[in-house]
């Protein structure tokens, strides 16, 4: 599986520990890359060039158009809590249906809400 990620740690209402996610992904032999461009990573998921993407601290303008394209292409999308409405959340998981369950499990392992 090939996945991508993006992180920002400013002004968040949750704690995310990416190292826990990386350790679990290693057990699934997942290759993780960081392009630095959220919108491109989302579109790569839609095109089948990536199996998944997850990120937190994401800005709406970085993800909005890509989310629509990914949904239209059949990707599954949720926030780190499992809620499918990612338009109101700055953290999200996008993946092909085949990889979504495993990727979500790994990402959620490092997520804790402060609320």
Predicted regions and their residues:
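An extended, acidic
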Residues: 1-115
